[in-house]
Amino acid sequence: SDCPIDSTQQEGLFSVRIGECGVSFWCTNPPPEKPFPACLEERRLLIPGRRSMLGRKLLNWFNSQGLNVEILGEFDDAALMKAFGAMHNAIFVAPTLYAYDFYADKTVVEIGRVENVMEEYHAIFAERMIQHPAVQRICNTDYSALFSPAVR
């Protein structure tokens, strides 16, 4: 999940934060002319849905930066957002850890990173599963290498 479970509200459910990473903005070549983040006003944007924590964080970030962006669409799937972005010459957002996959596609370029807007990852499990070996392994694994910044 992209947010923790409040166990006082969701009885019997628990969550453990397993990592977080910043987000990057991507587009197909050629990149916008203005520097980041002003370039976000040059093309329409594809963002995570407002129901997601990341979608809400991004809307707040746009506002705090004084950016007047045009949102073309909201998506719950990063791969679909990337495909739609390529088809409509739009800028799209994805967690920076996706960079390894996106760099393989030479038609897609990273135009900027925001390290103070974080995508969070939480493992959610039922109380009855807390002693299950798989849940224990997920909760006790060090994921820091997975969430380290991608090299540009």
Language model regions located:
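Flexible hinge/capping segments at coil-to-helix
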Residues: Q10-R50, P133
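A late-sequence structural motif
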Residues: V109-R152
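Secondary-structure junction motif
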Residues: E42-Q65, Q131-P133, C139, S148-V151
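Short secondary-structure boundary segments
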Residues: S1-P4, N29, P95-Y98, V114
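Hydrophobic hinge/microswitch elements
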Residues: R51, R56-V109
